[in-house]
Amino acid sequence: MTTTQLPDTASPSPLEVDLAVLPKVSLHDHLDGGLRVGTVLDLAREAGVDVPADTVEGLAEWIAEHANGESLEKYLQVFALTTAVMQTREQLRRVAREFVEDLVADGVVYGEIRWAPEQLSLIHI
């Protein structure tokens, strides 16, 4: 009688590994492209900046619609909104802190974050 050796299923194949638990590197990440939607709403209300929706869900939908690559003009409207709420030291500090918190929550161990100081020239930080 012969026996058949079954494949070892105890160790997962590389495709079965849960990527969420692996350490990550984030290269060329834009600070003004990673704001939390709720933060955009909070900061816009505090600063009197007009937003295209008044709920987190509505604004998230607007952002997704404009960031889908349909047109550069629509895409850049998102950045016009996010940079509009990054015009004070306090706003910038909150955005940067939350950005790093989100990277950590995603398992990022090294991040290269980019931002455009010239976009903050509305009030000369």
Give the residues covered by each predicted segment.
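Metal-cofactor-binding active-site regions of metalloenzymes
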Residues: 2-123
